[in-house]
Design a protein with these regions (language model features):
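Conserved strand-helix element at the start of the C-terminal RecA-like helicase core
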Residues: 1-15
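Conserved RecA-like helicase motor-core motifs
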Residues: 13-40
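Short, low-complexity, polybasic intrinsically disordered segments
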Residues: 133-144
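Short, internal active-site loops enriched in acidic
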Residues: 5-7, 130-135
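Conserved RecA-like P-loop NTPase helicase motor core
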Residues: 29, 35-133
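Generic domain-boundary/flexible-linker signal
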Residues: 10-11, 81, 136
Length: 144
């Protein structure tokens, strides 16, 4: 899952560094503009091996062999620029950070659960951001 288009290289950076196994931010923007969900369907039908998305956090499930790896470009912190977060910070500053951390944690698990839909299901969780892996390890200890 890609948190932001700017987590990806642009087409110039891809050429300059010879990047092959990633999508450019321009190509992802084109995919995200497709309202038909063509790429999600192609991924679910195994027509493509990799799905890059900023939008597969809710409402789309990838059970069983449909998805065995989930890559987080970074920890899914909430967008604090939204009016909700600004109002909360002003009206209830003592609860702001607790709520913020809880929201981020729930977003992390929501994205993981896109690929986990039954007891025997599994996914590999990958990320260059150690906060993702640390949070997962910490939370999974509390579950088991």
């Amino acid at each position: 899952h890609i948190n932001s288009f700017y987590d990806l290289p642009d087409e110039i950076e891809m050429k300059r560094f010879g990047l092959k196994n990633v999508i450019s931010r321009e190509a992802l923007k084109e995919i995200q503009n497709d309202k038909t969900g063509k790429d999600v369907s192609r991924f679910k039908n195994k027509e493509i091996d990799v799905l890059f998305s900023t939008k597969c956090t809710r409402g789309i499930d990838f059970p069983g062999e449909q998805c065995n790896s989930i890559v987080f470009t970074k920890y899914p912190n909430p967008d604090v620029k939204s009016p909700f977060w600004n109002i909360l910070k002003k009206t209830n500053p003592n609860s702001y950070w607790d709520f913020y951390k809880d929201k981020a944690r729930r977003e992390l698990w929501q994205r993981i659960y896109r690929g986990l839909r039954f007891k025997e299901d599994h996914v590999y969780l990958l990320s260059p951001d150690t906060r993702v892996l640390d949070a997962f390890k910490r939370d999974i200890k509390n579950i088991i």
